[in-house]
Amino acid sequence: MKYVDIDRIYQTVPLDKIPWNSEAPPDKLVELVQSGKVRPCKTIDLGCGAGNYAIYLAERGFEVIGVDSSPTVIKIATENAQKRGVRCKFIVADLLGDLHEVKETFDFGYDWDFLHHIFPEDRVKYLKNVYNILKPGAQYLSVCFSEKDPQFDGMGKYRKTPIGTILYFSSESEIHDLFSPYFDIQELKTIEIKTKSVSHYAIYVLSERR
């Protein structure tokens, strides 16, 4: 199955019409920060989009690098950080490539609304990349759509969205089997998350890099 050109979407669709773009950070990410489960540290935002979540963390003392495959949205993210007066570094990189652009290792990494864009045959490669850029003992948060979610016709593992992307909807057991060779799973559960217009069932996994 072929991936959609995400950069083309960012070039042609206004940000306020892109369903995964949200200025407000997700409640679950805010909870991790406010509870102290994740403290200011070197952090990487995987599939950072317009950089809104990275900026939120940077404003709270985190040293954040955001990575995305779209040059268009990385430029937007850089401009957004400048407007907010925070220091964030944003890098164009293929998260399914060798990630040679990322020269550092991190204490905390996360992807939100990103893993479901990656098809199963590429997920081990992605997880190995995440593993390699995180320090031993680093925390990793990932949230992706659940197969229990009724949106986009509510049928099948692969579903096409109105914006044209094709997403893969996972089960908890799939996520467990994907993560467990590389990470010690601390929490794995199905939660409800809100996007601009609807709510989704999503799989939340918080883990620690071995």
Where are these predicted regions, by residue range?
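Class I (Rossmann-like) S-adenosyl-L-methionine-dependent methyltransferase catalytic domain
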Residues: 1-44, 50-102, 118-129, 139-210
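Short catalytic micro-motifs in class I SAM-dependent methyltransferases
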Residues: 113-117
